[in-house]
Amino acid sequence: MSLLERSRMFVHQKAKLVELTNEYRILDEEGQEIGVIRQEGQSTARKVLRFVSSLDQFLTHTYAIYDADGTKLVELRRPAKFLKSRFLVSDGAGMPVGSIEQENVVGKKRFRLLGQAGEHLGTFQAENLISWDFQILDAAGVPVGRVTKKWKGLGIEALTTADNYMVEIDESVAGPFRMLAVASAASIDTALKQDAQGFN
């Protein structure tokens, strides 16, 4: 089964002495690695800038999701920003799929999931002002997925720390909307949540 087709996955941050490049493992419910999320295109100078200041968050960033055999499935590219963020999403071959666009700069975080023609496919939003949990809603506002740090019944509780979370996406979600949902949910800590800091 492709990583993109899974209805449940667990995202676990790889331990680093100094976090200069984000990299997360994607695991199944048995704790087997099924993919990885990796920040790409960072020069040594960019890594140093990230370590010594917060200016790095305003520069262009690229993240990619790979499956277990190293095949690139999704790429997220965030052009340089000041306030609201916009992520351009493409498939592993570089073909545009759509975008993830931040709606607000105050209050609970909310991102629109848009198709390639700009059509509204769904929403990715925080459940409240202080919760880390997020909901995925379809175009009609119906919940079809969730990102949470609260889960039960897994065989990998030993891995649970503040930087781990569970992604659940309904099997009915398909096409570009599913790719955008997986991209936003799987990358919430590496891209969207960290990017929502600073002036946002």
Annotate each language-model stretch with its function:
Residues 1-62, 66-73, 78-86, 92-97, ...:
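Low-complexity or membrane-interfacial segments used for flexible interactions
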